[in-house]
């Protein structure tokens, strides 16, 4: 690596933790706060949408979204997210992280508002408009994954880099919690202001006209935190690593870094001949043998583990309400009015978020640079597997009223170890182990693989969790394999996560250039290197 360029990057790695590091966490993290709020808040209002738009006169049960509509409403944002992760991940490497960072946020703001303003002449028309806006909302959310992770990894020092990236991702927990709290406040306010009988007393009167405002307000609220951080995102300079390693402008990199971090460094413009173009192997692209040789197993590890994790994680999160209903923790729908049902579902999800989801994220932040990424991910998958089997095998035991608290504790622990485990580490590792010129792209590919898993979870679990008894299925659904067997399947998915975690290298305590071998590339070396995974002595070829 050219001397001046290496000085800039070494200064970043050695920089003390400063106020701007925390500012960057908040700026990037508020995007993830919004991401989680928008992606998970829909699960709080889907039952209300069914009551409002798909009520059937003389039916003994409140209206529910038809299977295809429910699948679309729950899953379309993930389809957009997958596309956004691939597109903006690639664009972040081509144009720079900063240039496209504001676009993703504005998409989130506009489409959050659009979701709440969905319209149509018929029920299906309203749902189609909602799905349109939620697809593009997901597209913006998708871009935030690779860009936020890459920006934070390239700003951070090597000592606390894992904690900084994990802290950005941990804002998801607050987003999920905020979704539940906002929904609680809105539904409680409307429930007290517009009294309504239960469905079994008055099927039509149980859904007051004002209920249509509840879901719209909940969805539109997601625009506020994103809008508040737009200005600060636009003020962030390009990362020094992108400017020095990809744009090849060391002088600008040093200048940008000095503006935000307390590091005095003067760099001169470097000749192009000093760049890593001296050896063709060191300018390899994504679809080359050289990339496959150096990083193929790494990319396979990050994509498969994120895919498997999101099948279990998103199916569990999106359909908490169905699991709670199945074990009897949430009363039968006909015993509540429409708005009170939103309140009840929100209360359950908020409790789980408070007890399991949020603490898990911040345990990762606290321990990731101590225990390492590999250990935390492996531990998380192991405990998720154990708790899923513990929920599924004695499932009938948990359905008894006196055992419901035990079920909720086990379920909370599953969510805890998902977040103090692979849900955080699958986000952190791809931002560290790939070269700067491909870092955002590879993170986008890994994240898109995760969202493919989320789509499988969102669409598959919706049908699979239906009772095998056709008389007990929700309206319009074919018989499924039941909640118990669905939980068994998720436990097996988590076990596969343990296996594929063995392909993921440890990146704790190393500089980004050391992990990705860019320091070797820049110096023109051609040494075969191995990366030690965790502290086990096991090595993965790179």
Swiss-Prot record:
GO cellular component annotations of the record = membrane
Membrane-related topology note: Multi-pass membrane protein
Q: Which organism is it from?
A: Arabidopsis thaliana (Mouse-ear cress)
Family, as annotated: Belongs to the major facilitator superfamily. Phosphate:H(+) symporter (TC 2.A.1.9) family.
Q: Tell me which PANTHER family the record gives.
A: SOLUTE CARRIER FAMILY 22 MEMBER
Q: Which residue windows are transmembrane per the record?
A: 25-45, 71-91, 100-120, 132-152, 162-182, 212-232, 295-315, 351-371, 374-394, 405-425, 444-464, 486-506
What does the function comment of this entry state? High-affinity transporter for external inorganic phosphate.
Q: Where in the cell is it found?
A: Membrane
Molecular function terms in GO for this entry?
phosphate transmembrane transporter activity; symporter activity
Q: What else does the entry mention about this protein? A: Although related to the sugar transporter family, it does not transport sugars.
Tissue expression pattern: Mainly expressed in shoots, First throughout cotyledons and hypocotyls and later restricted to vascular tissues, mostly in phloem. Present in senescing leaves. Also expressed in floral buds and sepals.
Supply the InterPro entries for this chain: MFS_dom, MFS_sugar_transport-like, MFS_trans_sf, Phos_permease
Primary localization class, coarse: membrane
Q: Keywords of this protein's UniProt record, alphabetized?
A: Membrane, Phosphate transport, Symport, Transmembrane, Transmembrane helix, Transport
Entry protein name: Probable inorganic phosphate transporter 1-5
PROSITE patterns named in the record: MFS
Q: Which residues lie on this side of the membrane: Extracellular?
A: 46-70, 121-131, 183-211, 316-350, 395-404, 465-485
BP term (GO), one: phosphate ion transport
- Induction of its expression: Slightly induced in roots during phosphate starvation.
What ranges are annotated Cytoplasmic (topological domains)?
1-24, 92-99, 153-161, 233-294, 372-373, 426-443, 507-542
